[in-house]
Amino acid sequence: MMRGVLVIMRLLCLGMLFTGCAGVPNSSAPQAIGTVERPVPSNLPKPTPGMDPDVLLREFFKATADPANRHLAARQFLTQSASNAWDDAGRALLIDHVVFVETRGAERVSATMRADILGSLSDMGVFETAEGVLPDPGPVELIKTSGGWRIDRLPNGVFLDWQQFQATYKRNTLYFADPTGKTVVPDPRYVAVLGHDQLATELVSKLLAGPRPEMAHAVRNLLAPPLRLRGPVTRADGSKSGIGRGYGGARIDLEKLSTTDPHSRQLLAAQIIWTLARADIRGPYVINADGAPLDDRFADGWTTSDVAATDPGVADGAGAGLHALVGGALVSLIGQNTTTVLGAFGRMGYQTGAALSRSGRQVASVVTLRRGAPDMAASLWIGDLGGEAVQSADGHSLSRPSWSLDDAVWVVVDTNNVLRAIPEPASGQPARIPVDSAAVASRFPGPITDLQLSRDGTRAAMVIGGQVILAGVEQTQAGQFALTYPRRLGFGLGSSVVSLSWRTGDDIVVTRTDATHPVSYVNLDGVNSDAPARGLQVPLSVIAANPSTVYVAGPQGVLQYSASVAESQQGWSEVAGLTVMGAEPVLPG
């Protein structure tokens, strides 16, 4: 017997990211990832008679990245009995720095596994980052067979090789309707399919299966059961190849449609169209239900223009332009000149945080008196841009406000109490309604120093203890709101986050105390990456963003970064007119 340490491989760092042939056991639960039946891809490893046990283990973990036919590629490395016993269903773990400690004999090898956890992949294709050391899953045992070494015992579940995972899976985004019916909400998924022509069917099937569990009560799914696909998605003319390529379009035939409401049918189409369009499956999109067009106006096919009102990439209130707080008052930027806005928000001093409404026509602003003193007092004011304002909340401290799609303003009072302020229909006076944040407080105790709602209003991103915490926004049957399913994003950011803003519905940008990387991005999966730092001075404070531009408050005033400029010119530049110490950017949201 001999003992040895085998380092399987060092997988890629998460960085810029943006599970003889053994049979499949009948008792194993089905794997929802990659439900398309297809042959094992030729680029995946296969066991060979002369393969050494350490090599076979390494190749097995590569093969687990392909879930097709219930991990058939990986099962080729197992004995029949091991394949019968292996339950590959459920959440898979993505691991890094994998080390096997072997105990080797002539006919049998036993290995224990050590690894770092990078994240997990659910059976719905939901990827979430994580960190920590993999708990001991139990030994992996190999035996020598007539066909070479095979795995005869292994832990249940799937451990994914990150590098092979990247080669096998592609990130796609499903879209569900927000509760107000005004837009669609992203739900990123990782899908493993062989060809482009299978992808459309896979994505529509996932829409029919519904949102991830934590979104189930935060969004609407117009494709919920009993609605189902009548057959695979085809080209608009019914052919099975070239789907969504050129002008061939895509045809989706549904059955058991129950809704007759035109707006609901429009939202149903929007879910399908944005899901396929964002996956580069081009229209026109012929959508039929029970043998007839979903909408007679679009019998020949829908385009993205037909559902433009729900476009998830549109910047809220783009026409309002950039505003800022300068010297405690709200100013607007016109060209390279600033003008103090008319009305209450131009007159009031000591404003410390503000946001324009999603339409850009209203303002919510926090006034803080005796900032930093023991008797500090803060108040929230809401009103029309250029008009008068109404006091809507008060406390010792208030966070920067954030607007929801229903024109409610969310703030954190005294660091822990989340509040919605919304005008009462009868009087027009603001109602102050507490938000249930118990789930957040129990898992992530500590002061909430920033809270910003996603543009669709279904998620809240918070800064707690310098970390980015994401929670769902759910409305209860009683009409109250709650923050649910909180989880941490961006483990690589540590506890350095100061302020955050939603750049898109899937992408958050943050300022940090890290002088080397003072601005970073993090997406809904939890993957973080660093923005360029050229031109920035630290410390940075408030950040505000839209899909095209990121603005930060720094020692020299407000700076901006736009990825749309030439790469040679990319970097942070001063915003003319806002090069004033203490100036803070203000955008809709």
Curated annotation (Swiss-Prot):
Coiled-coil spans in chain: none
HAMAP family cross-referenced by the UniProt entry: LpqB_lipoprot (MF_01373)
Lipid linkage positions (N-palmitoyl cysteine): 21
Membrane topology field: Lipid-anchor
Keyword Zinc in record: no
Main location: membrane
Compartments where found: Cell membrane
Lipid-substituted positions (S-diacylglycerol cysteine): 21
Protein name per Swiss-Prot or TrEMBL: Lipoprotein LpqB
GO CC annotation: plasma membrane
Entry superkingdom: Bacteria
Keywords, in A-Z order: Cell membrane, Lipoprotein, Membrane, Palmitate, Signal
SMART domains, alphabetized: Germane
Homology family: Belongs to the LpqB lipoprotein family.
Gene: lpqB
Signal peptide (residue range): 1-20
UniProt keyword annotation of Electron transport present: no
